[in-house]
């Protein structure tokens, strides 16, 4: 499905959630003639007002349910195919500190390899890595300096989604 907006028009994309939702959605915001690209993430409150949480300048993103996702030939699979190039693991290390803003959390996340910001229950959190198993997260945690914040391993969530740069394991 394609959509084209007129110049300087925002296109809103909603994602279905629940048991009948797709496992993954790939989005491309390609713009070679106009200024502006990327995505703004957020939600609609009870008054149907958009509440922004974060933004990215990436042109191609993939939104996946929070479970292990296997990338093969540019497609995300829920079950492991015979050959795959990348895995987006659903196990992460999460710092125990809540941050007051996306920018504050991002500054800390960028100090860790594969660090990223998560928005959990109204709080900005820093997560590190996207591992395929609890044991892999535990191994990485034992090798990661988190003394200033403390950390725990978090497992896949039935209500979470992961936004990654398409065809990579970058969250």
Walk through the language-model features, giving the residues of each.
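Conserved, single-site charged/polar hotspot
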Residues: 1-171
């Amino acid at each position: 499905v394609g959509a084209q907006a007129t110049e300087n028009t925002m296109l809103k994309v909603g994602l279905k959630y629940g048991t009948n939702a797709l496992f993954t959605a790939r989005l491309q915001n390609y713009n070679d003639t106009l200024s502006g690209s990327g995505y703004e993430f957020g939600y609609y409150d009870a008054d149907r007002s958009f509440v922004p949480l974060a933004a990215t300048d990436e042109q191609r993103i993939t939104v996946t349910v929070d479970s292990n996702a296997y990338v093969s030939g540019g497609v995300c699979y829920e079950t492991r195919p015979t050959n795959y190039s990348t895995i987006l693991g659903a196990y992460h290390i999460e710092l125990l500190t809540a941050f007051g803003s996306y920018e504050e959390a991002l500054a800390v996340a960028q100090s860790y390899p594969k660090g990223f910001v998560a928005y959990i229950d109204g709080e900005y959190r820093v997560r590190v890595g996207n591992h395929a198993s609890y044991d892999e997260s535990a191994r990485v945690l034992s090798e990661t300096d988190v003394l200033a914040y403390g950390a725990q391993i978090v497992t896949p969530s039935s209500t979470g989604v992961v936004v990654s740069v398409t065809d990579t394991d970058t969250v």
